[in-house]
Amino acid sequence: MWFEILPGIAVMGTCLVIPGLATAYIHRFTNGGKEKRVAHFVYHWDLMERDRHISGVNRYYVSKGLENID
């Protein structure tokens, strides 16, 4: 019947989801607890550069928080 295809769809869906989740967790682990940011547009690149300058350690993923910005 039609429901015999459900296990195959579940396996295929799981195989498609695992790489995306693994990538997010690897980026969080390597970038100090934050996901990797991707700049597809110039505006996003400018925001990442601003965060890099504000952090003081030349890394965009290290945030100081608004209360610590001079």
Swiss-Prot record:
Where is this protein primarily located? mitochondrion
Localisation = Mitochondrion inner membrane
Pfam families named in the record = MWFE
State if Hydrolase is listed as a keyword. Answer: no
GO CC entries: mitochondrial inner membrane; respiratory chain complex I
Q: Per UniProt, which keywords does this protein have?
A: Electron transport, Membrane, Mitochondrion, Mitochondrion inner membrane, Respiratory chain, Transmembrane, Transmembrane helix, Transport
Coiled-coil ranges per UniProt: none
Role this protein plays: Accessory subunit of the mitochondrial membrane respiratory chain NADH dehydrogenase (Complex I), that is believed not to be involved in catalysis. Complex I functions in the transfer of electrons from NADH to the respiratory chain. The immediate electron acceptor for the enzyme is believed to be ubiquinone.
State the family it belongs to: Belongs to the complex I NDUFA1 subunit family.
* Assembly and binders: Complex I is composed of 45 different subunits.
**Under what name is this protein listed?**
NADH dehydrogenase [ubiquinone] 1 alpha subcomplex subunit 1
What is the originating organism of this protein?
Varecia rubra (Red ruffed lemur)
